[in-house]
Amino acid sequence: MSGSPVKRQRMESALDQLKQFTTVVADTGDFNAIDEYKPQDATTNPSLILAAAQMPAYQELVEEAIAYGKKLGGPQEEQIKNAIDKLFVLFGAEILKKIPGRVSTEVDARLSFDKDAMVARAKRLIELYKEAGISKDRILIKLSSTWEGIQAGKELEEQHGIHCNMTLLFSFAQAVACAEAGVTLISPFVGRILDWHVANTDKKSYEPQEDPGVKSVTKIYNYYKKFGYKTIVMGASFRNTGEIKALAGCDFLTISPKLLGELLKDNTKLAPVLSIKAAQTSDLGKIHLDEKAFRWLHSEDQMAVEKLSDGIRKFAADAIKLERMLTERMFSAENGK
């Protein structure tokens, strides 16, 4: 009998090992794909909701959102907006039935440079969750990590007790500003940073530890832990399991079902790479960023400037596609009469 736990441990999947020192989050709108991996939390974005909303399995939710938009009435544009907010919340509510933790729901990326509009939309999403019987403690509102988005996050946290997840984070400047704003969680991207370096430099492949996305998250994690910031660091946007393993020990990692599946089948030994203890010995100095300093430092990072604007454009394009899809479903019959 005494040998069995050792044997069991030897066969433990990389996913189960990872869960021992990092909170694992599922990055998907397809909530039927969540069960197998037993994540703590889940994240969604406009692109993931758009993909899920086109699956046959989720048409009832789409119909419910459409009915809600129509019931509230008003101009066509208003009905669509209400239907989309409702759809995001319906997906979030279903996801919450399958996880013990929190779900992240994103504010429309087209509001990324309008602080007040982001605050208003976030409050509306929380209101819709409340109508569905879900406490704001189980929701993270995702906002773009523009200066305006970060200030919206600060206001939502301080004045409304709404927890925020700052997304599309590519630069150290963005991470520092988020820490100073006191938001609940940040999502520094890994894979999209790698994509940029592969596309814009001569180097086309990287070992995980040398991956520029991995190095970015490592630096941010070390900075937060060295200076005692409470904001959770959640690495996001992975291209392979090597990147994930190289960030083992990070507070949270949000991972697609495809890569969660690969980790589940992988039995290689995993050890934490990031740690609070190691962060204390890093040579990072503390900095303060007001708006001018933030804009300057962020603009110095060509990759981050390009990937932030590219990310906003992509999420905005998918929001528009979702609007068109709902417009067609809601009004094409009426318009055809």
From Swiss-Prot:
It is an enzyme of class 2 (transferase). It comes from Cricetulus griseus. Pfam families: TAL_FSA. Keywords: Acetylation, Cytoplasm, Nucleus, Pentose shunt, Phosphoprotein, Schiff base, Transferase. Pathway: Carbohydrate degradation; pentose phosphate pathway; D-glyceraldehyde 3-phosphate and beta-D-fructose 6-phosphate from D-ribose 5-phosphate and D-xylulose 5-phosphate (non-oxidative stage): step 2/3. This is Transaldolase. The modification Phosphoserine is found at S237, S256. One of its GO terms (molecular function) is transaldolase activity. InterPro entries: Aldolase_TIM, TAL/FSA, Transaldolase_1, Transaldolase_AS. The active site is at K142 (schiff-base intermediate with substrate). Disulfide bonds: none annotated.
